[in-house]
Design a protein with these regions (language model features):
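Helix-coil boundary/capping segments in enzymes
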Residues: 1-354
Length: 354
């Protein structure tokens, strides 16, 4: 059943510390984490006390941002008229150096989300959190969770140990494609390498702004290494990438491809055509002034109404309006596409469950 209510493609449940995940782990990992005294495993992409991590009026004293399901219902689902929302848990399991430890944490997070969020709120769906540092284990986790149709996407950080077009990652793409699950690439890094091409940032400001570079690099890696040739129906969703980098990237990718396409003969279509067919972006953060004229110009440069997906990014503090996560200047028809039609077309399982 299709609903006119909005579909939020990016909300973040507050994942508990390791102690809260132990019940979802094997006896071996319970003993290992306990005896080694490992409890916190938080990502540095969103430090818990950073202002951007949680809007001030959504921050509950003594609780992790996004930890309360009741608050999510009131502050996001009801406030924004959301009929369905996709949970994208951010967990240190996705960046652990130990592949098996990372896989254990990711599996525990998926089972925790299933029990504490999906089973408790019928409007919620979730992404399968996978250990991208271990593609074979990631593929196994996709197989384990895919039978639950409430899992609608595969989730991993955009900056991993190497470029995502490399065949090393293809077991993940193959498993996702087989189950018709989009792959969500979320802003964030394993920090195996500097997040910029010229070295390590000195401040969070620099690290955060540099994230758009990773999205550009990985997108071109996927194209030039033939991922979309091998998996022509696989969809990638750029989550929290910002949007305004895309028009300039499209122009430069097309221009350069025309000049050196002999190097990559398997890329038989324009990068822009591939991106418009196989890539989507969430609208928060939009990374543009709250100026309707500027927003309209950017949307016109993207030149495809299918590409943008509604997202509040709850509880992160990304947009200035307290009423609507959508940027200003969108026509009613385009706003409807972004809120409902595009998410339904991007996530096949939502067509079954919305």
């Amino acid at each position: 059943m299709v609903t006119s209510a909005a579909i939020d493609c990016d909300i973040h449940p507050g994942v508990p510390d390791i102690k809260g995940l132990l019940p979802y782990m094997s006896e071996f990992w319970q003993d290992s984490f306990t005896h080694r005294g490992i409890d916190g495993f938080d990502l540095m992409s969103y430090p818990l006390n950073a202002p951007i991590t949680c809007r001030p009026d959504w921050r509950a004293k003594g609780k992790r941002p996004g930890a309360s399901l009741d608050a999510l219902r009131t502050e996001a689902l009801d406030a924004f008229g959301i009929g369905t929302a996709i949970c994208n848990p951010l967990t240190g399991g996705q960046v652990a150096v130990s592949e098996t430890m990372g896989a254990a944490i990711c599996s525990a997070v998926n089972d925790w989300v299933r029990e504490h969020w999906l089973d408790q709120e019928p409007r919620l769906r979730a992404s399968i959190v996978v250990p991208a540092q271990a593609p074979l284990l990631a593929a196994e986790e996709i197989e384990r969770c895919a039978a639950d149709r409430r899992f609608v996407q595969v989730l991993m950080p955009v900056a991993c140990e190497m470029m995502l077009g490399r065949s090393y990652y293809w077991p993940i793409w193959e498993a996702a494609a087989r189950h018709k699950l989009p792959v969500g690439l979320h802003a964030g890094s394993m920090y195996r390498y500097a997040p910029t091409s010229t070295g390590w940032p000195s401040h969070y400001l620099h690290d955060y702004v540099a994230q758009s570079q990773a999205f550009e690099d990985q997108l071109l890696s996927l194209i030039s290494n033939g991922v979309f040739n091998k998996f022509p129906d696989l969809m990638f969703v750029m989550i929290e990438s910002g949007v305004t980098w895309l028009p300039g990237f499209l122009w430069r990718a097309i221009k350069t491809w025309r000049g050196v396409r002999g190097e990559v003969p398997w890329v038989s279509r324009s990068p822009a055509e591939i991106i418009r067919d196989n890539v989507r972006l969430t609208v928060q953060p939009f990374d543009a002034p709250a100026d309707a004229t500027i927003v309209e110009k950017i949307v016109n440069q993207i030149d495809d109404d299918r590409m943008l997906l509604f997202a509040s990014d709850y509880p992160h503090w990304q947009f200035s309006s307290e009423e609507d996560p959508l940027p200003p200047g969108l026509s009613p028809a385009l706003a409807q596409r972004i809120r409902v039609d595009n998410p339904l077309a991007t996530y096949p399982r939502l067509q079954e469950t919305v």
